[in-house]
Amino acid sequence: MMSYSLRVADLPAGDRPREKLLSQGARYLSSAELLAILLGTGQGAGKLSAVGLGQFILKQLGERTGDSTDAVSALRDITPEELMAIPGVGPAKATTILAAVELGKRVFQSRPGEQTIIDSPALAAAVLAADLMWQATERFAVLLLDVRHRLLGSHVITVGTATETLAHPREIFREAVRRNASRLIIAHNHPSGNLSPSQADLDLTKQILQAGQLMEIPVLDHLILGNGDYQSLREITPLWQQVPQGDGSA
């Protein structure tokens, strides 16, 4: 194993994981830095620091998944024994990591109750997380809202394979009419964790937006969920400018 003697305490204050989290927010920390906060310490004098150990753990996980760019996903179902097989990770560090992973899952799976006003993509993703976030196959779901954006319910429209799912606008709007919904948010998951929309995703979104115009039921967003994160297509594509929904926002 490569020697890494620089301690976290020797880093400039702005580069230390805890200080960086407090000053910039958790989103701006690398996965290795987040692990370092959980680990607390590294392997001891003259060996890997906490950040170095975090990097080493991710390297080991990347080898386990066969994809170094998606190492974090291996934490989803890892066992204590598998973690403790990594040099420098004993029972205390392993249980801390596993507790954090489980807490993160529970946060994402805790959904707002009906009548909650859904006023952001993050809140919509929280409602849909239990149905979409960690699934091994693609699913397409719809979030049903009233005219004031209050939550009426959610419904999984279709379940596909590990790489694709199919949904037809007819099925989506049938559920909206059945529940007397005035607004919709559609969503599907990418089991790979890659949240970039495919051309098929964009084409389907445009079809559904056009159907929303005809039905006079605005489609507020299309979310892609996966691996603990989400992407709003309304925020990153011009589709809502091309097919306005008459919902009072551009």
Swiss-Prot record:
A Pfam family this protein belongs to? RadC
Q: Which UniProt keywords apply?
A: Hydrolase, Metal-binding, Metalloprotease, Protease, Zinc
Which molecular function GO terms apply here?
DNA binding; metal ion binding; metallopeptidase activity
UniProt binding sites for Zn(2+): 188, 190, 201
Q: What GO terms describe the biological role, i.e. biological process, of this protein?
A: DNA repair; proteolysis
Query: Looking at the keywords, is Metal-binding present?
Result: yes
Q: Where is this motif: JAMM motif?
A: 188-201
All copies of the MPN domain together span 116-239
Q: Which domain of life is it from?
A: Bacteria
Q: Does the keyword DNA-binding apply?
A: no
Q: Which family does it belong to?
A: Belongs to the UPF0758 family.
Q: Which PANTHER family match?
A: DNA REPAIR PROTEIN RADC, UPF0758 PROTEIN YEES-RELATED
Q: What is this protein called?
A: UPF0758 protein tlr1707
- What is the originating organism of this protein? Thermosynechococcus vestitus (strain NIES-2133 / IAM M-273 / BP-1)
